[in-house]
Amino acid sequence: MERIIVTAKFHTGHRQLGYPGKCKFVHGHTWHGKVTIAAEEFPRDDIDMSLEFGDIKNVMRFMDHKMLVTEQDTTFLNSEFFEPEGVVVLRGKGPSVENVAYYVYNGVVDVIRKQYPGRNVRYKVEVTIQETENNIFQVEKDITI
């Protein structure tokens, strides 16, 4: 089994609409992300590279210094005070650590699909997102591309 492990740190703001506690207010985090991709044997390009690590890291870094929202947060989406390129819209009902992890997971799967389409390789993709020192969410799925 071969593994690629990529880590990144990124800083964002967010808020949890409808949450009864302090997280309903705009606040920020320094997130730590870790992506592990495993395969029995990775395909290699013509210079024997398996995947472009920078493309995987950029999935996480794209969120750096941006406001994370969902489609329900019309305050940010419709505001003239926020630059559109400073806002990242996540799927789901809130910009939770769970939805950040799935945002990264989906982005990593897109990177694999673009770099090695149609190779029929089975990958295990694991994304770990640490929101705070104590709050971590992990998603792990097998895919064939």
Write out the residue ranges for each language-model feature.
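Charge-rich, low-complexity N-terminal segments
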Residues: M1-I145
